[in-house]
Design a protein with these regions (language model features):
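Short intrinsically disordered, low-complexity coil segments enriched in acidic
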Residues: 1-4, 134
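Short secondary-structure junctions
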Residues: 3-12
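Conserved C-terminal structural/oligomerization subdomain of aldehyde/semialdehyde dehydrogenase
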Residues: 12-14, 21-147
Length: 147
């Protein structure tokens, strides 16, 4: 309806017709405004949007309301580093996808969530921290003196 072209998949597997299952699907999008390129799909769907420059690719990736995860694939390690730092996503995979560790924090940005699950960051977010300073000196010192 919006001009996207299904390159493969896009249908239910016959043997799984009783559920909400779809074959892995690749959609070629004429621009970044196709819904499948702008919403968070929790299914095997890849929306492909063509770009000419690195800057345009970053702009396309960041031009949506979501930012759970992203992936950058390139033989140029410096480009991978540069682009991954520019993407507005809670997780960025470089030359891999879905490497997950329970020790690492997990979470998105924008409408994909606030805060982190797993790892130290998740524990830290649940704590109420307080700083307490104690002086063992019997002499009352100037409270406005920086030590």
């Amino acid at each position: 309806k919006q001009g996207g072209k299904v390159l493969c998949g896009g249908e239910r597997p016959k043997e799984l017709s009783d559920g909400c299952y779809f074959l892995p699907t690749v959609i070629e999008c004429p621009d970044r405004n196709v819904d499948t390129a702008k919403i968070e799909l929790f299914g095997p769907v890849l929306s492909v949007v063509k770009f000419k420059t690195e800057e345009e690719a970053i702009q396309i990736a960041n031009d949506n309301d979501y930012g759970l995860s992203s992936g950058v694939f390139s033989e140029d390690v410096e480009r991978c580093d540069r682009v991954s730092r520019s993407l507005e996503a809670g997780i960025c995979f470089k030359n891999c996808y879905r490497f997950i560790s329970y020790a690492a924090s997990f979470g998105g940005r924008k409408q994909s969530g606030y805060g982190r699950e797993s790892g130290y960051d998740a524990i830290s977010a649940m704590q109420i921290k307080k700083t307490i300073w104690t002086s063992n000196s019997r002499v009352t010192e100037d409270p406005f003196k920086i030590r």
